[in-house]
Design a protein with these regions (language model features):
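Short, Lys/Arg-enriched anionic-surface-contact patches
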Residues: 13-26, 32, 68-76
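Basic, amphipathic alpha-helical hairpins
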Residues: 13-19, 31-42, 83-91
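Basic/polar phosphate-binding segments, predominantly the helix-turn-helix DNA-binding elements
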Residues: 44-72, 97-119
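Basic, Lys/Arg-enriched C-terminal extension of HTH/homeodomain DNA-binding domains
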Residues: 78-80, 96
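…primarily DNA-binding HTH/wHTH and HhH modules…
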Residues: 86, 111-142
């Protein structure tokens, strides 16, 4: 009798794990982990916590969002760096780059340009909001 219950429970869990509801929860948890880490979490860590293979997590995430967890990490980290550059006059650009998880200032500069289309030199300039930041709106359309 208990083996029948175990079999039924396993079947239920197996079906639930394939359901859209479960996949949505997986994506929400992945987004939560990425945002809470400031974009500094790898797919290995995410998949360990979710107890699924990195490939499965990437596939489900991309199916629901249209891009990879790594791309979201890059977006979140670049956005954090941009906000710190805009709001924090007490830290140097090098300090901000390290705080955001970049290897160095040039790494942050390349990522900001690649991901958001801006450079640290552009931050604070009026045309940042009139031109370049318009392109970042399409990036956050998820």
């Amino acid at each position: 009798r208990s083996s029948d219950l175990n079999d039924e429970f396993r079947e239920y869990l197996s079906e639930f794990a394939r359901s859209d509801e479960y996949k949505e929860m997986l994506v929400q948890h992945t987004v939560h982990m990425i945002c809470n880490s400031g974009g500094n979490v790898g797919i290995e860590r995410i998949s360990q916590e979710l107890v699924y293979s990195p490939r499965y997590v990437e596939r489900v995430f991309k199916e629901y969002t249209g891009f990879s967890p790594k791309k979201m990490c890059r977006l979140v980290r670049a956005h954090k760096a941009l906000l710190m550059l805009l709001c924090s006059k007490e830290f140097s650009k090098t300090m901000i780059s390290l705080e955001c998880g970049y290897a160095d200032l040039s790494h942050m500069n390349r990522e900001l340009k690649s991901v958001l289309g801006v450079t640290p030199k552009m931050v604070g300039r009026e045309d940042l909001y009139l031109g370049s930041m318009k392109t970042s709106q399409t990036v956050y359309n998820f």
